[in-house]
Structure formats: C-alpha cells, structure tokens
C-alpha cells in the first residue's frame, strides 16, 4: 500500500499540541480519496453506537473546532488528528542530568588522562599528533560498550541515569604546523566531530580539518560519537535486524555527546599543558567543527555544551528519519533491515517511530535551544554556520534548511544561481544574511551537481558534492571568520556561492 509521509518544514515547539487536517487529497488518477466511514461519522456528527469511535468524539470535536477557527471547513476534511510534541524535559532531561553529574565528577575526581602515542610530523601540515585516553564516569550499563543502555537505579519512568563505573574514553589531538612557523601564535581550542560511523582519527585523514587548523590557528581534538562510531557498527546492524533494541543506540548517542562535553572540559583543564603538545599555547573560547554526522550531532552538542559558543556544521541536517531514506549511505543498511522488515512501508514507519528516541541523541531534539530558550548551564550567545552542498547525496539539504529556520539563521543571498533550485523561492522563510552578522547563517555551496529529487529518494545523477565545501579553501576562509572573528563574511562577492569539486 502507498504511504503518505508528511514532514513539517520547521521544527515544532517542545510540548505543544498540534491539530492536523487533510483535504484535497487525490490518488494518482486525480480522483478524490474517500475518508473512512469512522472518520465520516466523527466529522459529520453521526452517532454510531460503537465505543471505539464514540470514545474519541470529544477529542475530535475539539480538533474540528480548532480547524474551523483557522478557517478550515470540517465538511471537506478527509482526515484529521491531534498530536503533542515531546516536552523539553522529555527530550533533554536525561542528557542534562548526565552532563551535570559528569561535570561534578570531573571537578571533584576527574582530569586524569594517559597519552598513548606522540607522533611528531604525523603529516606535513601537523607539528605533532597526540593520542590517548581520558578517565570518565560512565552512565551506561556494563562498561558502556555498544549494546548497553542508560544505567538507572529506579523503575520510575521519570528517573534520570546514574553513574556506573569509570571508563577510558579515546581522544586524538593535532597541533597544526603553523604553531612551529609562528612561535608567538596563540591557538584556539577546538573540537572536531567525525562523520557517519567513523572515528576520532578522521581528524587525521580528513585533510580539511588539518587545513582549517592551520588556516584559522585552531588546535583540534576529537573523540568518538559513541553510539554512532565505527565500534558501534555491529550494534547498529543488530538494531536494523531487531528495532526493539534501538534504545541502546539512542542512549549511547547521548553518552557520546557528554563525552565531547567532557573532552571540552579537559581541553581547558590541563590536557594541552602536557609536554607531548610541545609547548603550544592554547587559549580562548572553545569552538566546534564537524561534517556530515558531525554536522547532524553538532547542533546537539552546541545546545548542551556549557563552553561552546560558535560551531561550523558542514553538510549538516537533523532528524534521521527524514535523512536516511534520502541518503545513498542508507542503501547498505536498509539491505540489512529488509529481511526482518520486508515492506518499505513498514521500514519507513519504523524509522519514523524511533525518531522519538533518536531526537534525544541528535540535533533534532535540541535546535529549539540554540537561538533562544538555552538549556540550563549553557551559554546564551550560541551561533551556527551551516555549510550545505547543493545536491548532496548523503545528507539532504532539506533538513539543513529546517534546522536553520529553527535557530533563526539568516541565509546568504543569492541563495543559488537562477535555475539551480527546485524550490519556488529558494531559502524561503530565512532572512538575507548581512556582512558582519554575528548570529547563525546558512550558506549553500554549488559545485555543479544536479539538484536533489523532489521524491523521498536519494539523488543518483551527476556526482555527489558531499565533500566539496570543506575541501575548498574559500568556504574554509568563511569558517575562519565565523569561528575566530565572530562574524559572517561574504566570500562569494555578492553572488551565489560556488565550491570547486573535490578531486
């Protein structure tokens, strides 16, 4: 059977109740779709004597009243319903409790780390690479490994996780070569977030991270996105076979965000004073840079972190249930899911249902708390720079626009060149960016790939531009201005932004 997926083009308000009404819906032949007899009975006030229908009448009459007040005639409706968005406490209460307990532990007992390798000139553009582990209290069951879930000491549904044993969390840092070339340079502390099911070592093999470190004078450190890192691939595959275990991914993703918060704390409490860093001087506000999954998770980290003010999110988005079916990356994983859930309709519904848990572990549950209503213990001056690749095969630009609207971002104009967007008004709902702005901005980088399909399928024509914005020094110069100088600079000369295709 066909399935109609309706996705709001903006993030809905936490805890609010919404009424939805459907009218004018036709099939592929252009014929009006008849509403169900049960809905007609409710809509037209027909008594059925059926408890399952009559028990819903008061609720539905209230919904019809709301629609009527909005100028929508109930007689033409084919379907209507109400729903309530998860509250801020439901979405963020667990992670804030875990963050606060973790920071308390760090202040009283933490700060221990072990350097396991020091590699001078690991690359031509790196002065020294330092890898190791840091000790951290764990809020997962067991040893916090993939497949574990949050640790509770109560069956109370409102309980928050409690500490378990202390574990070792990996990290890797790179001192950029520019620190050798200018001994008086004070580097900024930065965190880097890796891509899909990757590792902290993306900081090394990702040439864009090393390049930005040198161009902007940032000493980047990275850890794993626990729950969505390379060591989680096995549990991700097991979850695709049996989604009843999905909570283990969602819980560990929240632990992973807190691990980044802890690494940020360690950055400011002695890590870079270790002799292995070669005396590099590091000072200033902590900044964040991440790509792909690092862009998806980065908005959650930005909302939760007590230290990060400015973040660059490369090829970003929010809401995995929207992203996956439009991503070429999901093809392999959907093949794992298919034997257990052979219907595409069923798979789509499952991904939509588990988004209620996923919201707690990715940006979708947090973007309402960046431009306004900051979460407890966080800064109120947060700003995001979204760098979007037009026609991206892996992270649909649709979700980046939704996130940008949520944080009140402005958009670089012209958004794209004439004829390069399927939107009637490209960048609708966003005000034009102004040179020197210090708030959130979204910029669309066009490297010549075909615009994304209208249908909910991955792009498949021309080439994938996913890597292009980060690999071009022009977009990176904009990143530098945003992160270091706290301002937006139009590096496109007042024209639509172009990125060179990656090699």
Q: Where do the language-model regions lie?
A:
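Primarily recognizes the serine-hydrolase "nucleophile elbow" in alpha/beta-hydrolase
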Residues: 266, 271-325
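Structural recognition of the beta-strand scaffold that forms the well-ordered cores
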Residues: 84, 189-192, 219-224, 287-289, ...
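Acidic, low-complexity Ser/Thr/Gly/Pro-rich repeat segments typical of extracellular/periplasmic
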Residues: 1-137, 141-144
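Flexible loop/turn segments at secondary-structure boundaries
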Residues: 140-141, 180, 196-201, 227-232, ...
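C-terminal subdomain of alpha/beta-hydrolase-fold enzymes, centered on the catalytic histidine
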Residues: 252-255, 309-503
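Surface-exposed acidic, glycine-flexible loop patches that form ligand/cofactor-binding
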Residues: 9-13, 162, 174-185, 211, ...
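Cap/lid segment of the alpha/beta-hydrolase catalytic domain
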Residues: 144-168, 181-277
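Short, solvent-exposed loop/turn and secondary-structure capping segments
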Residues: 17-21, 28-39, 94-97, 142-147, ...
């Amino acid at each position: 059977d066909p399935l109609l997926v309706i996705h709001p083009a903006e993030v809905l308000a936490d805890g609010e109740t919404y009424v939805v009404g459907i009218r004018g819906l036709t099939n592929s032949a252009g014929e009006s779709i008849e509403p169900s007899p049960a809905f007609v009975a409710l809509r037209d006030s027909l008594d059925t004597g059926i408890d399952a229908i009559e028990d819903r009448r008061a609720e539905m009459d209230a919904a019809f009243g709301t629609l009527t007040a909005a100028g929508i005639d109930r007689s033409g409706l084919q379907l209507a319903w109400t729903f309530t968005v998860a509250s801020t406490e439901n979405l963020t209460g667990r992670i804030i409790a875990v963050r606060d307990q973790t920071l308390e532990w760090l202040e009283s007992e933490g700060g221990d780390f072990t350097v396991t390798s020091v590699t001078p000139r690991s690359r031509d553009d790196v002065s020294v690479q330092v890898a190791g582990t840091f000790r951290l209290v764990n809020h997962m069951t067991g040893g916090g490994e993939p497949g574990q879930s949050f640790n509770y000491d109560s069956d109370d549904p409102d309980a928050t996780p409690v500490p378990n044993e202390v574990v070792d969390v990996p990290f890797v840092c790179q001192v950029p070569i520019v620190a050798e070339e200018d001994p008086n340079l004070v580097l900024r502390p930065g965190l880097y977030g890796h891509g899909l099911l990757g590792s902290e070592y993306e900081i090394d093999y990702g040439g864009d991270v090393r390049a930005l470190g040198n161009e902007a004078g940032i000493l980047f450190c990275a850890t794993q996105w626990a729950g969505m890192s390379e060591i989680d691939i096995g549990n991700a595959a097991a979850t695709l076979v049996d989604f009843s275990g999905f909570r283990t991914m969602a819980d560990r993703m929240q632990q992973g965000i807190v691990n980044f918060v802890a690494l940020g704390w360690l950055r400011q409490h002695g890590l870079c004073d270790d002799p292995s860093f070669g005396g590099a001087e590091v000072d200033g506000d902590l900044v964040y840079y991440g790509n792909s999954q690092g862009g998806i998770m980065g908005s959650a980290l930005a909302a939760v972190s007590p230290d990060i003010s400015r973040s660059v999110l490369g090829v970003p988005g929010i809401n995995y249930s929207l992203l996956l079916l439009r991503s070429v990356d999901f093809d392999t994983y959907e093949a794992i899911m298919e034997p257990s859930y052979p219907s595409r309709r069923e798979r789509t519904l499952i991904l939509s249902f588990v988004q209620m848990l996923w919201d707690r572990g990715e940006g979708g549950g947090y973007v309402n708390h960046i431009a306004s209503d900051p979460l407890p213990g966080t800064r109120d001056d947060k700003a995001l720079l979204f760098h979007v690749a037009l026609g991206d095969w892996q992270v649909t630009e649709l979700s980046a626009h939704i996130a940008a609207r949520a944080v009140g971002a402005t958009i670089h104009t012209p958004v794209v060149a004439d004829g390069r967007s399927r939107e009637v008004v490209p960048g609708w709902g966003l005000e034009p960016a102004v040179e020197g702005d210090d708030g959130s901005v979204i910029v669309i980088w066009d490297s010549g790939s075909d615009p994304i399909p209208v249908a909910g399928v991955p792009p498949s024509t021309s080439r994938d531009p996913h890597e292009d914005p980060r690999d071009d020094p022009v977009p990176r110069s904009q990143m530098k201005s945003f992160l270091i100088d706290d301002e937006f600079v139009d590096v496109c000369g007042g024209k639509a932004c172009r990125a060179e295709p990656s090699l």
